[in-house]
């Protein structure tokens, strides 16, 4: 939901901006607000009974660089192959104060959207 990996997204876009690249258009993720998703469901004929954003900080099993290499490829598309490692290192260091604890454990700033909706029978 809205705000999911917001810290990560901001670090990626800022690192691209420092390289003269507009990263906003490279964002592949859709994390809707409650209002936006409710409206989408309603347009498809659903009656929303419950909808909420649920902050869900999620511990990562490894350092965040692996997460970036897996899920943030679209942000790296305009970079030359030999520039990607430095880019990832820069993003990791930007994220460290917010998403890494004093023991070196990383946490992703996930936000879930949870809802219950029914589609009335015609």
Language-model features: locations:
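Residues at secondary-structure transition points
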Residues: 2-3, 32, 82, 86, ...
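Alpha-helical elements of Rossmann-like donor-binding domains used by nucleotide-donor carbohydrate transfer enzymes
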Residues: 7-11, 36, 66, 86, ...
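C-terminal helical/coil "lid" or tail adjacent to the Rossmann-like core of SAM-dependent
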Residues: 44, 49-103
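C-terminal beta-strand of the catalytic ATP-binding
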Residues: 46, 117-121
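Short hydrophobic/aromatic beta-strand or adjacent loop that forms the aromatic wall/cage
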Residues: 109-116
């Amino acid at each position: 939901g809205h705000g999911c990996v917001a810290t990560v997204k901001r670090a990626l876009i800022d690192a691209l901006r420092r390289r003269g690249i507009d990263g906003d258009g490279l964002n592949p993720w859709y994390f809707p607000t409650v209002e936006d998703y409710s409206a989408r469901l309603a347009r498809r004929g659903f009656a929303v009974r419950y909808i909420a954003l649920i902050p869900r900080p999620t511990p990562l099993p490894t350092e965040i660089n692996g997460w970036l290499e897996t899920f943030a490829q679209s942000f790296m598309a305009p970079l030359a192959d030999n520039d990607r490692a430095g880019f990832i290192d820069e993003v990791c260091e930007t994220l460290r104060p917010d998403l890494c604890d004093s023991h070196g454990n990383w946490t992703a700033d996930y936000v879930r959207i949870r809802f219950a909706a029914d589609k009335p029978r015609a």
